[in-house]
């Protein structure tokens, strides 16, 4: 894996971990419905960023789109 691809892989992993943490916190019984809604509204943005980073990682590895 190239250094650039390694960078993107670390970024993908950190974004995936953060996304999972948001979902976990939003589903805690102590989280208000309003806060949970606000947290979960961020998830599609994380999904988009992760998908884009996967494309960049693949491009760094020379994988055709």
Question: What are the functions of these language-model segments?
Answer:
Residues 1, 61-65:
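Glycine- and charge-rich intrinsically disordered segments
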Residues 7, 11, 24, 28-62:
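Short, charge-rich amphipathic interface segments used for partner binding and complex assembly
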